[in-house]
Amino acid sequence: MYCVQCEQTIRTPAGNGCSYAQGMCGKSAETSDLQDLLVAALQSLSAWALLARELDIRDRTIDSFAPRAFFATLTNVNFDSARIIGYAREALAMRDSLRTACLAKAPGTQCDHPLADLRLQGEDVATLRRQAAEFALDSDRAEIGDDIHGLRMLSLYGLKGAAAYMEHAHVLGQHSEAIYAQYHHYMAWLGTRPCDMDTLLDNAMGIGKMNFAIMAQLDKGETEAYGDPTPTSVNVRPLAGKCILISGHDLKDLQMLLEQTDGLGINVYTHGEMLPAHGYPELRKYRHLVGNYGSGWQNQQQEFARFPGPILMTSNCIIDPNVGNYSDRIWTRSIVGWPGVRHLEGDDFSQVIAQAQVCDGFPYSEIEHLITVGFGRATLLNAADSVIDLVAQKKLRHVFLLGGCDGSRDERSYYTDFARAIPQDCLIMTLACGKYRFNKLEFGTLEGLPRLLDVGQCNDAYGAIMLAVNLAEKLGCGINDLPLSLILSWFEQKAIVILLTLLALGVKNIYTGPTAPGFLTDNLLAILNQRFGMRAISTVDADLNGILGHA
């Protein structure tokens, strides 16, 4: 195996990347290799989808399947080799159907792509693993060099993150022919193993720009379905009674679970990136959506073990449920998979509900502890004039966007310490699961505004970006001239594509941590610093003084 896509990848003087029997995430070498083969199959599919478009042939089923299957290769999503092979077979079957349609419309049509005629060379896993070696992501690294390899990975992993957001939008009924075409373009291009540095950098920015449109699409889908998020208090302590925990990002799954449990006396708790769901009017109207349980995804083996009911995983992040001995109580949905864990097909949650009814549930209610969520795009934009007034009156010195992915490294305490150190005349916006480092602390208010504003899930960076754009327009300045600084934490591929989106939009001087991506060389980091001012976090005092010294 060779995998370097997440923040916890193995790092050694000889090179970075997980390359042993098992990755740091728990992914087996077998599954990792088969995911490489799946990616190649999806690149073959995209090559034919592009050619089909030239002949005015489009297939919505294929366009939605491709990013969904790609999503299965993200960190902590699908560890089930059998399902990965199934996706690869399905991709090539769809590819062949496109080939047939193209030949029927234009006999003699040929696809000039190195993966156009890719075939799986066997039925058994061992044979497919041997074939997968041809598509290992580092197979030509010695030939092309670490810089080109790193830029390829930047685009590949960024496109993975964009594919995940495409799937989230698709679930909510959002489609865009322009986005599908762009996705297939970048996917097919990556299948050619590009080697030109300028093209690789340009296309990485192109993927970031495309993702901005995807996030807008997802924002539209969520707000049309569930209303604009508004500030809402959420209890983070359990209540007595039967219970179900839902984790991941899929608000549609939460909606269906709430509908199917309504009136049954079962309390539903959100976990991880589901926390922002409480801000949506059409979700919080369900009285049995009673609160949020737990913290960042990396703590789930301890927290899920203590949860006295079933757990539903709707997207990333799942880790080995056997460690906490709750594998009989966890269920997977959609693209999520773990060997031996029960997977739900369709939208019937009756098996999960039945299990909740026989589980013990919480024996008593704990003392309530409320936190506030729901500072979505509309709420932020409505507050823009107040922010401008506070800045003009010199009552608001600076705004910090402090958030991103959480993880297990000790260095992530930086984000807790940074939040605590931010002066009282500054606001803090936060998003994604990195907020769990400090979202239960008390930050008070600034002239009536809460100092801590929970913007939402990772994709809700869109709302923060739109606030920045709106403020810049009203103040007649550029985004980089605002009293705004971004201090981001990363772990996986959604964070990579959000970073690419910010860079593509011209946002500069972003602080990132806790470590640099393992696929980015010192030379590439220097290029990103030179072009965009992107820099690594250092110490809280040094970074805070560096920012406010210029504020």
Curated annotation (Swiss-Prot):
Documented EC number(s): 1.7.99.1
Binding site for [2Fe-2S] cluster: C3, C6, C18, C25
One GO CC term, this protein: cytoplasm
Annotated compartments: Cytoplasm
Keywords, comma-separated and alphabetical: 2Fe-2S, Cytoplasm, Iron, Iron-sulfur, Metal-binding, Oxidoreductase
Co-factor note (free text): Binds 1 [2Fe-2S] cluster. Binds 1 hybrid [4Fe-2O-2S] cluster.
GO BP annotations, alphabetical order: response to hydrogen peroxide
GO molecular function: 2 iron, 2 sulfur cluster binding; hydroxylamine reductase activity; metal ion binding; peroxidase activity
Positions of hybrid [4Fe-2O-2S] cluster binding: H249, E273, C317, C405, C433, C458, E492, K494
Reactions the enzyme catalyzes: A + NH4(+) + H2O = hydroxylamine + AH2 + H(+)
Domain of life (superkingdom): Bacteria
Modification Cysteine persulfide occurs at: C405
Cofactor: [2Fe-2S] cluster; hybrid [4Fe-2O-2S] cluster
Family as reported in the entry's similarity comment: Belongs to the HCP family.
Name of the protein in question: Hydroxylamine reductase
Gene it is expressed from: hcp
